[in-house]
Amino acid sequence: LGDVYKRQVSTIIRIGRAEKFIIAMSELIQRLTVDHLHIVGDIYDRGPGPHIIMDELMAYHSVDIQWGNHDVLWMGAAAGQRGCIANVIRICARYGNLDILEEGYGINLLPLATFAMNTYKDDPCECFKLKGNPDYNATEMLMDVKMHKAISVIQFKVESQIIKKNPGFKLEKRNLLHHINYEKGTIELDGKEYKLLDKNFPTIDPKKPYALTKEEEDIMERLERAFENCEKLQRHMHFLLNKGGLYKVYNGNLLYHGCVPLKEDGNLKSVRIFGRAYKGKGLYEVLESYVRKGFYAMDPKEKELSLIHI
C-alpha cells in the first residue's frame, strides 16, 4: 500500500499538480476539522481587505455572523444613510484604506478628492494625519489627509442633522460647531474657552455651521448613489443580513459583539427607542429589526426612521 501512495505522490509531482494537491488537501482538512464557523463581529474594523474576507466567507460551507458596530456602519452606508457613508469614508481615509472603497468596491471618490485638494490646497491638515503606516507615496499621503479633513467636516454636518431630528437620542452635546468662535479660533465648552488646534474651516458658515455647501451636498448625493448602486457591496451586505444578527445562541453559548447596557449593580439597563423602553434580549431584537427594516422596508418613512438607528 505504501508503494501505491508513493507512486501517486510521484505522479502528482511529475505532472505539476503538487501545489494544487496540497491546497485541496488543506481545504479538506479544514472542512473536516471546522464544522461551523462563528464570526463574532467587525469584519470591517479599520483593517485592509474586508471585501476579500467577505468573498471567502460567502464561499464557506457553514457560517454565522454576529454583527459588530463597524459591520452595522457599513450596512447603513450601503443602505444610503449619509451619516454612515461619511463615517465609513472617514475611517478608511484615517487608516489609509481608501483602496477598499475605490478598488475593492469600485466606488468613485474622485469628486471628494478633487474637492478636498481644492478646498484645502494650502492647508497641511496636521490634525488629520493618518493612523498606522499605510503604503503611500508623498502625493497619495497629501491627498488622503485632505480627504480625511474634508469628509470629517461633512460628517459633523450630516450627523448634526440626524441629532436635531431625533432629540430622543440625547446627543445634543455632540453638536459642537456652533460653539466655535471662528474669528478667534477658539471653542467654548461648559463655560471654558479652548484654543483650536485647527482653525481653517472654509466650508463652515458661522451663521449656519451645520449647513452643507453646494459642493458638499453634490458630493454626498453622488456618494449616496454610489453606495446604494454598488452591486458587490450590496451582495456583501445582504450576506451579512442573511447570515447574521446582533446575537446568537449556539450549543448553549450566547454569542454577541460589543456590550449590553447594564446598571451599576449589574442588572440590565433600559434604553428608550421611539419612546419605548427595552433592555437585554429585547433591546438587541428591536435594534436588529430596525437594521433589517433599513434595507427591506417599502415605506420610505419607515426606512428612514430605521436607518437613523443604524
Show which residues each predicted segment covers.
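Active-site environment of divalent metal-dependent phosphoester hydrolases
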Residues: 45-47, 70-75
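Extended, H/D-rich, highly charged conserved domains that either
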Residues: 162-207, 211-220, 224-308
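Non-catalytic, alpha-helical, charged scaffold/linker segments
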Residues: 95-213
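Low-complexity, highly charged intrinsically disordered N-terminal segments
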Residues: 1-32
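Short secondary-structure boundary/capping segments
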Residues: 4, 53-57, 78-91, 261-279
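Active-site neighborhood of phospho(di)ester-bond hydrolases with catalytic His/Asp-centered motifs
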Residues: 38-41, 64-68, 255-256
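Short, small-residue-biased leader/transition segments that mark boundaries at the very start
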Residues: 4-5, 69, 310
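A catalytic-pocket lid/entrance helix-loop region that shapes and gates access to the active site
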Residues: 74, 81-104
